[in-house]
Amino acid sequence: QLMSDFSPPRVSTSFERKVGASLCKASELAMSDKLPKFRLVSAPTGGSKTTSSIALLAMLANEDKGFTGAYICKTIEECEYVYRQLKRLVDPSVLAVYTSLHKHEASPTKLLEKKKELGLEIHDHFDAQDLFSSRLIITTHSRWKKEYDDEVDLGVRKYKGNQRNLFIIDEEPELFSIFP
């Protein structure tokens, strides 16, 4: 279903299928009882990491009603893209996206700026509390990192008080900075 979004629609390449298989295996290992819990899938830009990740989350959420996951993006634009794709593949009631532009009190000025600058139109808005009660969430690196830095529960790592089953962190997050 995701492949039909391309213009013209196309089938996945052998390389993209291998990336998808690697992502599935890494996710399986990350969710298993084996340590370490972190797995990395590296592929060049356009290698289908994002598309495979979206498809995997959708499949897991649709097949296992107890599955919970978080997709962590670098930018608001990426969050909106992932949200739109997942919204087509899963029951929207299990899904929430939360960024400064997805919250109900988002600045109309900022929304207009992003529309003019990037053609980004955000129509669905959520409360921060929606992260705690949604099986699948999408948010930014900064919110995910804030949970660790401030030692607070912002609904990213946990669903209804329990650790989420799977976290997909798209792109390399800046986990620390070095200042001169």
Per-segment meaning from a language model:
Residues N62-D64, A128-L131, K158-G161:
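Conserved catalytic network of the ASCE P-loop NTPase/AAA+ motor domain
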Residues K34-A55:
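Walker A/P-loop
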Residues V90-Y148:
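Inter-Walker segment of RecA-like/P-loop motor cores
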Residues Q1-D33:
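Pre-P-loop entry segment of helicase/translocase ATPase cores
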Residues T68, S133-I137, Q163-L166:
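Loop/turn-to-beta-strand initiation segments
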Residues T50-S52, M59, G66-V90, V94-H104, ...:
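Conserved Walker A/P-loop ATP-binding site and its immediately adjacent core
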Residues A43-T45, K74-I76, T139-R143, E171-E172:
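Structural motif
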Residues H141-P180:
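Signature of the SF2 helicase/ATPase Hel1-core->accessory helical subdomain module
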